[in-house]
Amino acid sequence: MPINRRQFIKRSAGAVSVGLVMPKLFLSDALAQGPINPNRRILVVIQQAGGNDGLNTVIPYTDSRYQSLRPTLAFKEADLKTAQGVSTVLGNAPFGFHPALAEMKELYDAGKVAPILGVGYPSANLSHFLSQDIYHTANIAGGAGDGWLGKYADQKLVGQSSLSAVSVGGGSLPKTFFADKVVVPNISSFANYTYQTDQRNAGDRNNQLNTFHSTNRRDFQADSFLKVIADTGVDGADGAAALQTAIAGYSSPVTYPANNPLAAGLKMTAQIATTISAANLLYVSIGGWDHHSEEIGDNQNPTNKLVGQHNTLLGYVSQGIKAFYDDMAAHGLADNLVIMTWTEFGRRPNENASHGTDHGTANVMFVVGNPVHGGKIYGEQPSLETLALDNAGNMKFTLDFRSVYATILDRWLGADSKSILGGSFENIGFLG
């Protein structure tokens, strides 16, 4: 079936992950980092795919309803200590971080982390795919259309380096980056991000590349749409090689934690952001948050809240973000960086019979960085009282997630959030 240029742009972005197609990029001034531009604004988005349990992330440990609804899963104040015995209670606030968030607590105490409570949207959809699409697009009427950062790219990044926005480490391009005018590359690994030719003979590889260049440039000059395809492939061959050259110059005093998939993705993100000055929108995802069972515990102690799937994943997030923050700081970019986390929905207030939680509504987001007015909580924890829950027994959201997006668009990226989000949403005080 024939496709139009708009469809091609979106499909080709996915092909980039296997090193076949990439848009025009890499002007020479975009490769070298050079002196730090004080006006550079970097946004890194971290998706927690599957629906994180927000109530056991930023924990309302003083709430008697929280304790009664979760007789096995609930944390008491005495539980809110790291492995080193450091409290994760958030000062005088009636909340504490999960003990696995030790590094995030350190950043919070330094004023660099803003937890945002009660995040959601009207008539929440509890399907993973539909709710993810809603967060990707900021369209609560079914999640159709381009992504919210794709719309930003169409407004601000046309004609700029195509590494201005990059998805890192995933299998396919996140819908957040779907756009009409800009192709966003999806780099699953640096090793695979090359134009694929026979690697056994360097001379033959060069011949293949030269033939690809000359044939495609010659054959597709007459047709504007086919020329888009040819240009994309030809410039992809050039750009993939240039990317390898750029990241070869990366070095860091920071050791990222081993066996941590998010840390691995964030290290790739740092390699791009610290060596390519045009790379300012970056995206990485970590899955596995759908804990209908065995959210806590292991075979030896099934009710131990300090081990288990949720503990492990939160540790990945905390350790990964801290290593990435330290890396960016070591490269002089801490003042240029904002990190935002999101997940498609929260979990139900009550635990189930399998030491897990089922799909819920209101949840927690984090915004991290030197420009963030952190060290305090934003938003309002939804009431857990029976009469305050919705008809399905879920929490009622208190803050529209699009307000978080609007704040970042308006106060960090210098965009018009109303045109991107399709309406006006309250800016929150964590930036600006």
Question: Residue ranges of each PLM-predicted region?
Answer:
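Histidine-centered active-site microenvironments of extracellular/periplasmic hydrolases
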Residues: 343-376
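Feature for exported/extracytoplasmic and membrane-associated proteins, marking the mature portion
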Residues: 1-331, 350, 367-368, 376-432
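Short, conserved beta-strand edge motifs with alternating hydrophobic and charged residues
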Residues: 283-285, 338-342
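Alpha-helical scaffolds flanking conserved acidic
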Residues: 41, 336-337
